[in-house]
């Protein structure tokens, strides 16, 4: 049975990814900053769960030690944990900037690096020649910066640069590194963003949602399962020759 570890798996996109990977036959290590969320999802799926703060290398190293002590390897790492706040550029504070970069950029870097250091020494997957796979959940804001999200967009641009550089350096070890760029996803975090944006723009939440829909050529809001499906593909053998890529899964909103 292949195994995977997903950060930020206690809710939203991360939970959907964990659920999909379990259906795909993976043993999934469910991790989250909030231990009770990780426990709830882990118990629901019958999978191990860990409290992990991705901004703390010690937490990530402890998680790696648990995984390798029990399983001896890690086939797939999904760096999903992330945060978002919203504010006009002229009103942004250093604290907001630092918070977004600490989790989205530094947290993704620490997560990928910590597990890649162990992956390089493990044997390839049977019959595939790939040692392991790293997937980072970025955002369409990493391709097309968004108003009110200068700090968030910049932190996700950093993730794409990290993915490309890591893909080049880890290719000789036969470790693939890719990103997924979601758009307007129906999650609790998105609901908070809708409320913030409505307040900042003087609109109702319903008007903000309709604006999102107008910007999405395929005409609906994204579900967490849409993102999970792309991660499932990247985890499988059909994606073994893909690395350094950022897959847009946002209904075409990024080209609007």
Go through the PLM ranges and name each one:
Residues 88-89, 96-101, 212:
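Substrate-binding pocket helix/loop in short-chain dehydrogenase/reductase
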Residues 112, 155, 163:
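Active-site helix of classical SDR
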Residues 144, 220, 232, 243-256:
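Short C-terminal tail/terminal secondary-structure segment
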Residues 90, 144-150, 172-173, 188, ...:
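Active-site loop immediately N-terminal to the catalytic Tyr-X3-Lys motif
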Residues 78, 171, 176, 242-244:
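Short, small/polar-rich loop/turn modules that mediate ligand/substrate recognition or access, typified
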Residues 139:
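Residue(s) in the substrate-gating loop at a strand-loop-helix junction
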Residues 117, 168-169, 240:
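Alpha-helical segment proximal to the catalytic Tyr-Lys
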